[in-house]
Amino acid sequence: MSKNCVLKGTLIQLENDETKEIELLKAGEKLLSYSIEGIENTQDVSLLGKTKVNNFEGEFSYQLIKNIWKNTFESYYKINNELSITEDHYVICKKNDEYYWIQVENLKIGDSLFKLDNSFEEIKDIQKIEEEKTVYNIQVNSIYTFFANGYLVHNGSANCPNVTDCYACYHA
């Protein structure tokens, strides 16, 4: 069962070069997304990782936030001391000149992740941390990616089955 999320406090890239902590986002705000040519644009995580491309090209766009989900998760991964993310969350990976979506738990030292500055950063440190934390995910309207602490991540399924609290972004 999927709980693909990022931790509370993660900065999400919005329009106009603005960033905001994920837990402070509201429905109707626009976040920065990235569509990759040749890789299926789907919210169905069962299809992710099945397509690999040898030429990485894509396009930045802005997507409307529809919902934000809050949950707890008993462990997470910390990548390069910058990105804290649950094990089943998908990130775009470069390995051996191939590009594809991969679950965080399958990443290895030496793999590279796509960054907001249009570059790939090599993973030099990845740690699994066994500690319960509050986590969040975002539902957007069409391109199912966003930048979390500067890394491109996929938002997974809109029908996240373990969501305990669907905010619908009703922040007072």
Each language-model region and where it sits:
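HINT superfamily self-processing domains
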Residues: 1-161, 165-171
